[in-house]
Amino acid sequence: MNVSVNIKNVTKEYRIYRTNKERMKDALIPKHKNKTFFALDDISLKAYEGDVIGLVGINGSGKSTLSNIIGGSLSPTVGKVDRNGEVSVIAISAGLSGQLTGIENIEFKMLCMGFKRKEIKAMTPKIIEFSELGEFIYQPVKKYSSGMRAKLGFSINITVNPDILVIDEALSVGDQTFAQKCLDNIYEFKEQNKTIFFVSHNLGQVRQFCTKIAWIEGGKLKDYGELDDVLPKYEAFLNDFKKKSKAEQKEFRNKLDESRFVIK
């Protein structure tokens, strides 16, 4: 199998400023030291054609940051991502404008993807039908529920037939019938040897759908490998974490966060 996505030593840093004065110092003084947060820290992994990789981890671990970097909407501070093919990201509201109607968003988003108006016109009926939005397709997206936005975003991205698909919690909202229809459609992608990154807290879906697991903890890649090797370890960790009191869970998160802040 060919490598479709090669993530090489990817780090994403955010400078933290408490005041505008700190921000100005950082902009004007060369090599000025300031508090920096490591959203991701030196992550490397390879995805091959046909891989369905579940990105798992507790809230704030860095899963969405990584998915955005894979999708190209976010650039790493250090490192690089090589992609062999077109990438499409499905996340709640990703790339949608609240001021535009659903049908206007279809045209706008597909123009941004590089499609011609003639191609968009031909594909639009299929997108509308898959979305199940009916007359709401002519309403401004700002009036949509999160489930409706997810339906529209998924319908656009699945119809353009990408080589690499990044799904970030897009199936966590909306009705179960639509979610199952989406999964069935994704299975078709899987059979076509496309590469899929699947971000979800629903471990049932992860187990049903994924072939590999990338466990992100505190911005680092804690484990990566075959589903049957990594998922049981993550489930054991998650069960232990859920048994902790709220105070103990908070302490665990705080320790992880503290390790991600440095002065540089």
Curated annotation (Swiss-Prot):
Disulfide pairings: none
Membrane topology: Peripheral membrane protein
Keyword field: ATP-binding, Cell membrane, Membrane, Nucleotide-binding, Translocase, Transport
Keyword Chaperone on entry: no
InterPro entries: AAA+_ATPase (IPR003593), ABC_transporter-like_ATP-bd (IPR003439), ABC_transporter-like_CS (IPR017871), ABC_transpr_TagH-like (IPR015860), Bact_Polysacc_Export_ATP-bd (IPR050683), P-loop_NTPase (IPR027417)
Alphabetical list of Pfam families matching this protein: ABC_tran (PF00005)
GO cellular component assignments: plasma membrane
EC id: 7.5.2.4
Main location group: membrane
The keyword Disulfide bond is assigned to this record: no
Binding positions for ATP per the UniProt entry: 57-64
Protein task: Part of the ABC transporter complex TagGH involved in teichoic acids export. Responsible for energy coupling to the transport system.
NCBIfam families for the chain: PRK13546.1
Similarity comment: Belongs to the ABC transporter superfamily. Teichoic acids exporter (TC 3.A.1.104.1) family.
Protein name, as recorded: Teichoic acids export ATP-binding protein TagH
Organism the protein comes from: Staphylococcus aureus (strain MRSA252)
